[in-house]
A protein has these predicted regions:
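Conserved NTP phosphate-binding and transfer environment spanning the P-loop NTPase/kinase superfamily
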Residues: 2-139
Length: 139
């Protein structure tokens, strides 16, 4: 962010961009975009750490994306290093967590349906020091 950069000498900073940046394909067909993976993360984190319902998170998601487009995306190419934080097994965990949530939300049902061919996994398979822990329910 240039506002912060002007106060830190370039030789004293190292910029890291961390995000789930993997699109998911099934038999050559796009199943989920990387931002769909991120909405799964956001729905579950908000539910368990912010007491925000899944439906409420879905309602504000477009505003969240707008904020990213305005305040994060323009600067991601300035990062010295990019880390793709996607874990191949995380969708299996989300399937298990979300299966008990019923909703009239077409968006939630579409997202849940996109996981139909995935196996279910317990959140306990995620290592305790994984960045994924930020998005999982705490026991």
């Amino acid at each position: 962010n240039p506002i912060i950069d002007k106060y830190i000498p370039i030789n004293k900073s190292y910029k890291i961009y961390l995000s789930a940046n993997t699109d998911i394909y099934q038999t050559g067909k796009l199943l989920l975009k990387h931002f769909d993976v991120r909405i799964f993360r956001r729905m579950i984190r908000d539910l368990y750490t912010r007491s925000t319902s899944i439906d409420e998170t879905l309602k504000i998601w477009q505003k969240v994306r707008l904020g990213e487009n305005l305040y994060i995306d323009p600067f991601k190419d300035d990062a010295n290093y990019h880390i793709n934080s996607f874990h191949a097994y995380e969708l299996c965990i989300y399937k298990k967590i979300l299966k008990s949530f019923e909703s009239d939300s077409k968006e939630l049902n579409k997202l849940k349906n996109s996981l139909k061919d995935f196996e279910e996994l317990s959140a306990e398979v995620a290592p305790k020091d994984s960045v994924l822990q930020e998005f999982l329910p705490k026991n």
